[in-house]
Amino acid sequence: MQAKKPIEDLLKELQELYDNPADPVHKDYYSKLALLELCGWLELVIDDIALKYARARIIDPKNVELLEKEIVGKTYGCDYKANFRPMLIKIIGLTNVEQFENKLTTLGVFQILVSQLSSLASLRNPAAHTSIAGVMTTFQAPSTMTNYLNSLHPILTIVESELNAM
């Protein structure tokens, strides 16, 4: 899984800039950047979890290439239902995804994972496809993204561990 410290440090730096902006309008820049950076990091984590699992089990180089280019390589976004789950279904199959989700539910982390990733995706998607210029949009402070990170990181560690245990 991607290291937490670099994104944690970046979010901290963005919060410091947000708290002391050279121009008040820059607060929106730092907030939007924090959101996009956290979601980008989450996409990398999701990809890493899937790739690590699959590479440990797939032997045929053609299937590894298919995995990297067509399954993981064409998955964009950090939403569980729209991005991560379909990728897992292609890699481990629907019945195994069901077992995996049941295990995460038993551990009490599945609904939190789905809810937080969905929440972030609903913030990220419009932010990623619009410009701040001339638009009155407000974004949550970088500290909010740090809270998401601190909540999701241990859950993603469990996700990785439970997936690799299958």
Language model: regions and residue ranges:
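Amphipathic, well-ordered alpha-helical segments in soluble domains
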Residues: 6, 10-13, 37, 41, ...
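Short, solvent-exposed segments of well-ordered alpha helices
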Residues: 1, 25-36, 107, 111-118, ...
